[in-house]
Amino acid sequence: MLRFAPSPTGDMHIGNLRAAIFNYIVAKQQHKPFLIRIEDTDKERNIEGKDQEILEILKLMGISWDKLVYQSHNIDYHREMAEKLLKENKAFYCYASAEFLEREKEKAKNEKRPFRYLDEWATLEKDKNHAPVVRLKAPNHAVSFNDAIKKEVEFEPDELDSFVLLRQDKSPTYNFACACDDLLYEISLIIRGEDHVSNTPKQILIQEALGSNDPIVYAHLPIILDEVSGKKMSKRDEASSVKWLLNQGFLPVAIANYLITIGNKVPKEVFSLDEAIEWFSLENLSNSPAHFNLKYLKHLNHEHLKLLDDEKLLKLTSIKDKNLLGLLRLFIEECGTLLELKEKISLFLEPKDIVKTYENEDFKERCLVLFNALKSMDFQAYKDFESFKKEAMRLSQLKGKDFFKPLRILLTGNSHGVELPLIFPYIQSHYQEILRLKA
């Protein structure tokens, strides 16, 4: 079984979605079940409703799952596993207070050395502390694993101390809950971000202590860097939020296409998730950080907009008139996102705001003169744009730039865009709706 294990503590990050997509693809390729595990044991950081938001995003991406579980439902199991380790002398109670440990951390910082917990501290405050934590005994050997992307990774014994499994309130730490659940659900491969590399040896030690003889394969994805700063994209970066990208009008299929493409060797530029299942391979992923490029994402989104069928296009733009499909297709050529397309069609159909767009009083006056001339015309009486244009020029007594710029604004709501002769047939059939001024 493969899994995706998000925490409901904020917006879904593009790095997390990338991991979800890759786990889903490999699960499909290997004909294995796919598990979604909501890691909700950190009650203080959980945000209500974020779990459902994550699930909705996965559905939008075309990702389905065979099983959905909440980690908090397994707490009794986690405690049972901790008790097992205590009985087998693989774990121990630690009575050292948080204040004592904080002083030791500060001392290590001042001495410019890494902080390492010492097992001899375990009973120092046993008489005063009646709520101990449970720690796994530190290993006396190196921990190594063969990462599917990073290759051989090794941690020396002095890099790993006796870390906490259960907190004072008997709640499991992230690493303990994660390792226990991965065993419980028989997870065979975990694809996740490289920020989890330091967690992996701890989880391996926990699983070994619990008697696992079937090691999990790990694949740690390189981080995604911001295209401008070159730094890791954090949750503070708008574009790192999948929700933000969707709200900006990026199609789910384009987002998935892009996240599969970056840092990867792909056989074609534009593809669907189902197509990627046919050829995706972890071996083709680069070990170097990927750079996020919003301009290229917009390019891919533009290509996917062109691929939308008529029914989907009308639904996504909230246009009910099928006669406007051709116009939508023309506007797509100038749009990178669904939001841009919606804005174009809205400007086209809504009353025109010449106050907002006029350059000076003379320009506003020309707009009004031309507007009155156009109102007297029956657009459907003209066989083509050329004959319509000549009559509009004659009636308004305007020509050149004084004619064309006001004409474009009055007919499309925009000072630039698709050539007017191309969209004139759609203007003809909707001219009474189009030719209106904003009060």
From Swiss-Prot:
Motif ('HIGH' region) on chain: 6-16
The alphabetical list of record keywords is:
Aminoacyl-tRNA synthetase, ATP-binding, Cytoplasm, Ligase, Nucleotide-binding, Protein biosynthesis
Enzyme class comes to: ligase
User: Which GO terms of the molecular function aspect are on file?
Assistant: ATP binding; glutamate-tRNA ligase activity; tRNA binding
Q: Where are the transmembrane segments?
A: none
Q: Could you give a single Gene Ontology term from the biological process aspect?
A: glutamyl-tRNA aminoacylation
Q: Report motif location: 'KMSKS' region.
A: 232-236
PROSITE patterns, per this entry? AA_TRNA_LIGASE_I (PS00178)
Q: Which InterPro entries match?
A: aa-tRNA-synth_I_cd-bd (IPR045462), aa-tRNA-synth_I_codon-bd_sub2 (IPR020751), aa-tRNA-synth_I_CS (IPR001412), aa_tRNA-synth_I_cd-bd_sf (IPR008925), Glu-tRNA-ligase_bac/mito (IPR004527), Glu/Gln-tRNA-synth (IPR000924), Glu/Gln-tRNA-synth_Ib_cat-dom (IPR020058), GluQ/Sye (IPR049940)
- Keyword hit for Cytoplasm: yes
Q: Which reaction does it catalyse?
A: tRNA(Glu) + L-glutamate + ATP = L-glutamyl-tRNA(Glu) + AMP + diphosphate
EC assignment: the record states 6.1.1.17
The record's SUPFAM superfamilies line, in alphabetical order, gives: An anticodon-binding domain of class I aminoacyl-tRNA synthetases, Nucleotidylyl transferase
**One GO location term (cellular component):** cytosol
Q: Where is this protein localized, as stated in its record?
A: Cytoplasm
Q: Which residues bind ATP?
A: 235
Q: Is Cytoplasm one of the keywords UniProt gives this record?
A: yes
Q: Which HAMAP family match?
A: Glu_tRNA_synth_type1
Q: How does it assemble?
A: Monomer.
Q: What PANTHER family does the database record attribute to this sequence?
A: GLUTAMATE--TRNA LIGASE, GLUTAMATE--TRNA LIGASE, MITOCHONDRIAL-RELATED
Please explain the role this protein plays, according to its UniProt record.
Catalyzes the attachment of glutamate to tRNA(Glu) in a two-step reaction: glutamate is first activated by ATP to form Glu-AMP and then transferred to the acceptor end of tRNA(Glu).
UniProt record similarity statement = Belongs to the class-I aminoacyl-tRNA synthetase family. Glutamate--tRNA ligase type 1 subfamily.
User: What's the protein called, per UniProt?
Assistant: Glutamate--tRNA ligase 2
Gene behind this protein: gltX2
